[in-house]
Amino acid sequence: MTTPIYLATDFYKLSHREQYPEGTTKVYSTLTPRSNKYAPWSDEIVFFGLQYFIKEYLIDRFNDEFFSQPLEDVISTYETFVKNTLGKTEVYTEHLVQLHNLGYLPIKIEALPEGTLAPMRCPVMTIENTQPEFFWLTNFLETILSTTIWQPITSATLAYQYRKVLDDYAIKTTGSTAGVEFQGHDFSLRGMSSEQSGMASGMGHLTSFQGTDTIPAIFGVHKYYKAPLDFTTGASISATEHSVMCSYGQADELELFKHLLVDVYPTGLFSVVSDTWDFWKVVTEYLPALKNIIMSRDGKLVVRPDSGDPVDIVTGTKQNGTTPEEKGLIECLWDTFGGTVNKQGYKVLNSHIGAIYGDSINLERATAISERLEAKGFATTNIVFGIGSFSYQYHTRDTFGFAVKATAATVDGEERMLFKDPKTDDGTKRSQRGRIVVARKEDVLAENPEFDFSTLTGDQSNNELLWKDGLNETEVNQSSWNALRPVFQDGQLLVDDSLATIRERLANERSKQEVVQEETQLHKHLKDTIIDRWSKTN
């Protein structure tokens, strides 16, 4: 059985209700990315996944597993579990009886619109109880909120960084970003911790790309973000795996390629994993032998290497190489199939042939491959990147230091500003205090062109979003430019954004950022990497 939603938390949460000061009637908390210490490749996050959390947990699961269940069954399960695990002889359940009788979650959530870019330490959402007797509920929900939302945010942020890199190189080498929506392809599902985490992460990927092999992600955004079940949401192509190649045997590999091209897929796109035995033999012998068939097909053959150093396999070990290994896959395909030189002066492979690489790709390697292709005179869109669990599973809640922390409470009718600031910490865990407003610069300036932004927190020169804490409820309610909007209250979803809306919002955020033609933050982070080592060999 799955854990009942009213017990889907940490053990210590069960006892917090009795620990708050007597007379507590309100608890107000925030969700904040506190640090990019472990993610120097991004100083901002893409806010995404809250609507999924609200629909799946606050609405569906609470309705199915709590409110619609007989009260006596709920109480019996709760009492039995707590007695047997916490050693309690008497188990207090009146708070659950009251909540069950109420029939909905007395919770209010305000949040940035999903698809918004938020800098480090900027609160992205707030949560509070709406009825005084349920003060305990706010932070009771912390665990399920945190475990559900950190991964789609982190994966959406990583996908966005891939998209920025690929967009920038596409503009430099082709003059547009056409096709980049399919240049980043999600390969991660098999390496994620579960189908659910693969779905959540895969939904984040789909905020920036349409290419995916993670089918659960498409159904996820269909259910939670009103996305159609078609290629505009996510799409892939037919492709072989090593079991198929091995089934025919090494001696018949050339005939297998021909069989696939002529009999199985006489038209359309398909991909063939090509390193089952001798990758460079496939590239330099089999593909030239099949050139006429490939060029006469109405479609594209996509070559997929799956081992070796990704950067060297795709771009070669030398900038001006002579052997296949020195030239790399893209240059070898150009030598065999040719193509065109675009207006920007970069080589674009013939439309009948292409390449994808999906083994051990990360942001640094994708950047290095793009950098090398540009240096060799090739459009960077000649390669598709399979972004797998080596990218998406290598992250935790600590990647951006996500934390839900109480910053305000009402006790005996008095609003109290709560905060933590451990002396043994480096400042990362220092929380905001009181209630919070988040300001979008353009909204503030529209209302008051003379506004003094020094009264707000954040990077005054770069960030679109700034924030102010230390406020009480009245001061927050009087603010006319709070970017945090109500999205859930008293069991009701107040905002139901589509994936299309979120994609458009994120694209608009991207358009506000200058396309970097010089050294990017990621390039600075790479320093003495595979890019530099390659250039030193020439």
Language-model segment annotations:
Residues 2-40, 78, 86, 91-93, ...:
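Buried, small/hydrophobic-residue-enriched core segments of structured protein domains
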Residues 49-90:
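Aromatic- and Gly/Pro-rich amphipathic surface segment
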Residues 2-61, 209-210, 214-215, 220-228, ...:
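Gly/Ser/Thr/Ala-enriched C-terminal appendages of enzymes
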